Amino acid sequence: MKQLDFNSIYKNDSQQSTGLLFIRAYHKWHELIKSQLKTIDLTHPQFVVLTTLAALLRQQEWVSQTDIARFSDMDVMTVSQIIRLLVKKGLIMREVHPKDSRANIILLTEQGLQKVNQALPLVEGIDQAFFGKLEDKTEILNQLLIELETAND
């Protein structure tokens, strides 16, 4: 077979590519997450929006679509589409902001809170099993991920 002139600094050893290793590990983790969330009729982005909303409601009285997008680092339009779907599912609701009639606030319904409480143990269980294989290195991984995120803001 003809040898290709592959213009990569990792052409002789793909195991040296941090990006490739990261994306492979991410895909394995993400497949587990998607599979478990599917059993309770949620997608991963829906889970992120629901849990972000729940977390923000613990910290502040009113939560907007923009708050959810900012906190979850998701595109505002994507969050808007997900919110529309979650409203149809009866998991969240929109209300007019009590202090600004031009704005909406997003609230969890009782059914939405139940769904969050059903989903969290599934996702956290996957996290514990998947990242637990690192044993005592999980905290180091977390610190490195925080450092990467902060350095690339």
What are these regions (language model features)?
Residues 4, 84-143:
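Charged, amphipathic alpha-helical coiled-coil/dimerization segments
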Residues 1-40:
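N-terminal leader segment of winged-helix/HTH proteins
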Residues 27, 31-74, 78:
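N-terminal helix-turn-helix DNA-binding core of bacterial DNA-binding proteins
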Residues 1-11, 60, 136-153:
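C-terminal regulatory/oligomerization modules of transcriptional regulators
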Residues 21, 48-52, 114:
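Pre-recognition alpha-helix immediately N-terminal to the DNA-recognition helix
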